[in-house]
Every structure is written in C-alpha cells, then in structure tokens.
Amino acid sequence: MLGAVAHIGITVRDMEGAVHFYRDVLGLKVLGDITIEGDEADTITREKGVKLRAVYLRSEKDLKGPPVELLHFVEPAGAPGVPYPRLTNPGITELAFWVKDIEQTYTDLRARGVKFYSAPQLFELEGYGKVKAVYFWDPDGTTLELLQTVK
C-alpha cells in the first residue's frame, strides 16, 4: 500500500536561521527551495490565504534516504511556542541521523553552539545491536537525534 518515506516535514519560524542550521551546522545539502500559495495550498493545509516556503535538504552521504522538508508559513503566521516540549507527548518526537563517529560529531556540534539533552548514551537495541544515541534541539526546539552502531 505505502512506498518509501518521501520526506520529513518540519515547520520553522525563521527559514534563514533553519537553513543555516541544517545546511551549515549539520552539513545537509539544499536540494530545492520553493514557494507555494493559492487555492491548492489553502485546501491541503486547511488554512486560508496560505503562502509558504519549502526548502528541501538531504545528506550527501545518503542519496536514497528521504529529504528533510523545512516549511515556513509566511501567511498565516505560525503559533509561538516549541514543538513537543516533552518526548512523552504523543506525535512525532524526533528526527534521527546516522553518524560514523557520534563522539566526534557531538563534540563538533557542541563547539558550534548546539544544545544537547545529555552526552551520548549506549543502548542494546534488538535488531540493531549496540547503539550510541544522543538527542539535541534545532533552533525552533524540534528534537533531533544522532545514532551510531557500535561493534
């Protein structure tokens, strides 16, 4: 019935700041930048007078994986606040990225001002084996995760 995941959409308050973070801090590559408005945009979003900008980014290391879709609603303006302030809330809680060296990536991102929940933690996960994981926030408070398999 369903095919592969097409993209992961994240609504942001400040597109330029979000693009800087995902492109310049995390190292994703911009694939496209579009503006959407009109009746179709109003219908699909169930809002009136929609004008939104979408920027698509993807890791150059995983050309088959789904891109990240950053959405900025120019009109109507989005609500203030942070998404899912607690991981225990229902809904999509995080976007995870595989990395080769989690400790080095953690150190590099901290040096760039990225705020983390904690240092990387080691888990035994059925189907994956040993995995190191750590959560952090993007500029809008969306939770992101780094993962590394450990032998």
PLM regions with names:
Residues 60, 71-75, 149:
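Generic beta-structure capping elements
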Residues 38-41, 78-81, 122:
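A cross-kingdom feature marking solvent-exposed beta-strand/loop segments within repeated
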Residues 1, 10, 33, 68, ...:
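Vicinal oxygen chelate
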Residues 3-7, 52, 90-94, 131:
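Short, solvent-exposed beta-strand edge segments and adjacent coil->beta transition regions
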Residues 11-65, 104, 126-129, 135:
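Core segments of cupin and vicinal oxygen chelate
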Residues 73-76, 82-83, 117:
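Short, flexible, mixed-charge acidic loops at enzyme active sites
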Residues 85-88:
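Non-DNA-binding regulatory cores of transcription-related proteins
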